[in-house]
Amino acid sequence: MSTVTITDLARENVRNLTPYQSARRLGGNGDVWLNANEYPTAVEFQLTQQTLNRYPECQPKAVIDNYAQYAGIKPEQVLVSRGADEGIELLIRAFCEPGKDAILYCPPTYGMYSVSAETIGVECRTVPTLDNWQLDLQGISDKLDGVKVVYVCSPNNPTGQLINPQDFRTLLELTRGKAIVVADEAYIEFCPQASLAGWLTEYPHLAILRTLSKAFALAGLRCGFTLANEEVINLLMKVIAPYPLSTPVADIAAQALSPQGIVAMRERVVQIIAEREYLIAALKEIPCVEQVFDSETNYILARFKASSAVFKSLWDQGIILRDQNKQPSLSGCLRITVGTREESQRVIDALRAEQV
């Protein structure tokens, strides 16, 4: 009688799954962490709610109300979750039948769309972006049959550019009555004029992902939001865990979204954008850098001569960047989070010392 291992008992798609390689999972012994698009310094909060013997609210009112006020929408159009990553998964669980429906996304882009779908057993379809990293609308149209959720990251991670708003409108018209379009706006605080939040009334099938991990400087909190019309939110509420946010997380999130918290976030954005422009200008003068791409975010994508050697050389010096070589159309590319001036200088000095 053959022995069945524990791994044999697991679902086939889980056995075959390659987990998402987060910056933390990839590790490294760095002291300059520029690989996860985090804010470079800690922001301090004091806990005010100490009733930890009670379960938290499923959707903490102060957090929902504050976020709705900030985003300019109704509280009924907001769902809070454990990071935007949970929102990605909830949308698939609510709308996609495993083994029947598909999601669609446009690489090069964020890796969690595919991981979430594969974990649940939902087909992934890809339509690579055009040479300028804008949407291939004809390609998307050709592959929409059976697709229930389309993910579009704007500004896009890792390329840093915004998706053309007219293309978003065309996509929303193509998918009307067929699929949910998800605009991943994790980095929208760095270019707030480009948000699609004002489009929700016009498009009942639009959902928007947001996070406190980037401009709000709270990656360690794991707090994200899905903005959508009430009908979509009610469906997501059916599949979300009963207590997604712990009491301390809800406490700090509500403070971060207070009027003072919003002012502080906007000050951080101004500072990061100034630092980004400084770093872009410096990178353009460095011999081993072939190309620096425009960015609307808190990171910069650049193409390097001998990028793998450059990546390893900086890694060995404790400067951890994010290698994008395996992404479609990004051979030779590394992504650099915008950090402090001292961190920028470490990167610039290390790159200048590279022999090309």
Curated annotation (Swiss-Prot):
The keyword Amino-acid biosynthesis applies. SUPFAM superfamilies: PLP-dependent transferases. InterPro entries: Aminotrans_II_pyridoxalP_BS, Aminotransferase_I/II_large, HisP_aminotrans, PyrdxlP-dep_Trfase, PyrdxlP-dep_Trfase_major, PyrdxlP-dep_Trfase_small. Pathway: Amino-acid biosynthesis; L-histidine biosynthesis; L-histidine from 5-phospho-alpha-D-ribose 1-diphosphate: step 7/9. Keywords: Amino-acid biosynthesis, Aminotransferase, Histidine biosynthesis, Pyridoxal phosphate, Transferase. PANTHER family: HISTIDINOL-PHOSPHATE AMINOTRANSFERASE, HISTIDINOL-PHOSPHATE AMINOTRANSFERASE-RELATED. This is Histidinol-phosphate aminotransferase. The gene is hisC.
